[in-house]
Curated annotation (Swiss-Prot):
Transmembrane stretches, start-end: 311-331
Protein's name according to its UniProt entry: BOLA class I histocompatibility antigen, alpha chain BL3-7
Keyword Cell inner membrane among UniProt keywords: no
Disulfide bonds: 128-191, 230-286
Cellular localization per UniProt: Membrane
Residue ranges occupied by any Ig-like C1-type domain in the UniProt entry: 212-298
Length: 364
């Protein structure tokens, strides 16, 4: 079943007052992640609870307690093949979790001696990463309060790390309830199984590999230095490597590398920049590696061919002028020749009429 069935045992429904809530996943070859947020709003009713699920970088489900009819909803077409039982079951689980978060917010406020008037928030993240062979790489479960770490499941999935003395109270309760074992069983089992299922259902989208469109741009800083920026655009999945090299040697220590960003169309973009001496640009290359490429790309800044362009324009103009002049000369010669023939014909005609009176004169 789905992730949150782990919360079903009532012994685990008590976190601080003993409720067990959920947490994150880091990206591996493929990942399944759930993010929960609960926000108290004194004087405005029940806390708001929002849950979203991601496969890799694609949001595929969402629940919002403030919706007119709160239900888990699909966010991608390939999730619509799930039957009514799936959505009904998960909607019930989310509604239960919203109530757990409501209790947790009150309990944590007491742990930190906070007043009832302020707004507070809980964030939980959990999930699993699998490798290309479909086996578990890592599992995650983290819990935060008011933007700070609170408690997390350790990497071996057998013990907890508490961030402060208040979290130590929760840690002792969860250790007594065997919460770590329950979560380890889920992360190593059901989480991986559901991720495989989602990858199969959405394989046309999730398992595609769109290669990057890459190029290098040139930006002058001063007379002595320039910035070379290597761009990779329109690629999927998110994982990509951009490395500047100087005559084959990596320059990773000196280059500026931004985080991969969504392009807004389901693909990603990224760039890496390096400051180099002016005039030495051709000694530097950018190496691009991505799943969608059959082999890595090696790019170099290509200076615009301005001198050749200007020379071509000049030559073209000269040829045009020469052609115009030649045409004018030929035209003038042609005109002169035509006038000479007209004069000759006219003179011959006058002479013939004078000597031969028998020629018929045309009527006027």
């Amino acid at each position: 079943m789905r992730v949150m069935r782990v919360m079903r045992p009532r012994t685990l429904l008590l976190l601080l007052s003993g409720v067990l809530v959920l947490t994150e996943t880091l990206a591996g070859s493929h990942s399944l992640r759930y993010f929960y947020t609960g926000v108290s709003r004194p004087g405005l009713g029940e806390p708001r609870f929002i849950a979203v699920g991601y496969v890799d970088d694609t949001q595929f489900v969402r629940f919002d307690s403030d919706a007119p009819n709160p239900r888990e909803e699909p966010r991608v077409p390939w999730m619509e093949q799930e039957g009514p039982e799936y959505w009904d079951r998960n909607t019930r689980i989310y509604k239960d979790t919203a109530q757990i978060f409501r209790v947790d917010l009150n309990t944590l406020r007491g742990y930190y001696n906070q007043s009832e008037t302020g707004s507070h928030n809980i964030q939980a993240m959990y999930g699993c990463d699998v490798g290309p062979d479909g086996r578990l790489l890592r599992g995650f479960w983290q819990f935060g309060y008011d933007g700070r770490d609170y408690i997390a499941l350790n990497e071996e999935l057998r013990s907890w790390t508490a961030a402060d003395t208040a979290a130590q109270i929760t840690k002792r309760k969860w250790e007594a309830a065997g919460a770590a074992e329950t979560w380890r069983n889920y992360l190593e089992g059901e989480c991986v199984e559901w991720l495989r299922r989602y990858l199969e259902n959405g394989k046309d989208t999730l398992l595609r590999a769109d290669p990057p469109k890459a190029h290098v741009t040139h930006h002058s800083i001063s007379d002595r230095e320039v910035t070379l920026r290597c761009w990779a655009l329109g690629f999927y999945p998110e994982e990509i490597s951009l490395t500047w090299q100087r005559e084959g040697e990596d320059q990773t220590q000196d280059m500026e590398l931004v985080e991969t960003r969504p392009s807004g169309d389901g693909t990603f973009q990224k760039w890496a920049a390096l400051v180099v001496p002016s005039g030495e640009e051709q000694r530097y290359t950018c190496r691009v590696q991505h799943e969608g490429l059959q082999e890595p790309l090696t790019l170099r800044w290509e200076p615009p061919q301005t001198s050749f362009l200007i020379m071509g324009i000049i030559v073209g103009l000269v040829l045009l002028v020469v052609a115009l002049v030649a045409g004018a000369v030929i035209w003038r010669k042609k005109r002169s020749g035509e006038k000479g023939r007209i004069y000759t014909q006219a003179a011959s005609s006058d002479s013939a009429q004078g000597s031969d009176v028998s020629l018929t004169v045309p009527k006027v």
